[in-house]
Amino acid sequence: MIKLTAQQIFDKLLDEEKILSANGQIRFFLGDVDIIVKQKDVVGNIIQEWLGGWLRKREIEFDVSTNTQMPPDFFLNKKDRSRELLEVKAFNRNACPGFDIADFKMYSDESFISPISGCRLFNIGYDMDDNGNVTIKDLWLKKVWQITRSMDGWAINFKSKKAWCIKSARVFGTA
């Protein structure tokens, strides 16, 4: 197993794997039915799962978080889980990023006792056509503070439904 940083993985995906020119599809098999998934709302989770498979196939050291509701998605340093944390955020490139960065209370509480505030965000802008073909259009590696913005009366942008969630800014140059 080789140990890579988030930046090295980012560079490898862009430079060696040429991820921005790769094409894919999401297929589902159940019984004797085989379909190509054409619903965009599942693509982000599938891309995250694919990244884990890619890391495994390349024999890159990582652990997956057991708590899917808290960052990070991946620990890139198995011996020191306070360093090299990676969270995947994928969004439809033809729309505004609609993902929540984090639940504010969880994020503020955890920032005092663990290093999630230093987590790198792997931001993936994808496109899916009407035939279910998926392409990665853009890839960014950012820190939380690099993709947030302020809002009226607050230092950070929130949305409130059931909880206060930190929202991303339009830093990705989407349409």
Curated annotation (Swiss-Prot):
One Pfam family, short name: RE_NgoBV
Catalytic activity: Endonucleolytic cleavage of DNA to give specific double-stranded fragments with terminal 5'-phosphates
GO process terms (BP): DNA restriction-modification system
Top enzyme category: hydrolase
Its EC number(s): 3.1.21.4
Keywords: Endonuclease, Hydrolase, Nuclease, Restriction system
GO molecular function: type II site-specific deoxyribonuclease activity
Biological role: A P subtype restriction enzyme that recognizes the double-stranded sequence 5'-GGNNCC-3'; the cleavage site is unknown.
Protein name: Type II restriction enzyme NgoBV
Organism of origin: Neisseria gonorrhoeae
